[in-house]
């Protein structure tokens, strides 16, 4: 059975309960369909290499459990509200936290897994699907001390049991902030400027709201397809999985939602962000992909026509300007960046390590055939004699410049 809700005033359809017909085989892995997105793409939840997996979470060479953010010594942190961010900026205010200049540890882990396993399938994934890290404050005042404040999902899910697919929604048709915050709407860079464009790869985590739509309940066991594998066992064994959704700052500790394993089947609870949990990635396949075969069952999952394509990562560092970033480019195509000089610099290149071309604010590196790390710098504006005169410039003898030259 499919259910209907809305995202961005667009009808979307989702699976709930003990769904048995939402299995997909894509990119060499099994996935469960969560829902459609407002851009028409289809959101999938990772289920590993088998429909019977009891370890449907990603693993690195050394571990399979991750806290939200580690410091440079590898110590998990929860002593600042900014650590509920999938990305975060600097401390001191919500506005600062939402600058999204630093990757969380869980984002680094997910990005690493994607880079190692899914890069050739990037062309099939949506760049405009939104992955929500709702940091809207509902009650209390932002602080770094012992005073509690709560984020949007606490009001929606814990107080009212009214989930929403709209990031930052109060579930009443409006927003907790003055307007919807694009800083919490994670997307990859896209031509339509949807979301914040901060993701390097089109992958993230499930939200607590999506879990509730799927049949999850706050502080209660809930046996639904998120929990079950095709053998009606826990997809993650005893492991809990992190969602992308923060809940509160509580007595000097940052707290987020987690979904538990077989010890408390399907229980949607909370955990301090310095706890370690497992990660089940979420991706969104484009709406126009061609169905190849299957009926969605575990025995005969939907299979999408998706031939892996050589895809390369191009990193650009912009000195004396803005536009530093990373793009994924199919072999033989061009890498394009939007760049701009800082004040005092002009739209001309001083250095250009990869030989790209600059046209206005568009910088292009043609015919990508390998991974690249490139850098450019802009030329500094020269100081004219007129500017010196206007600034009352004098020479070493104390005389002002005079005349036309």
Task: Name each model-derived stretch.
Residues 333-364:
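Surface-exposed interfaces of beta-sheet-rich extracellular modules
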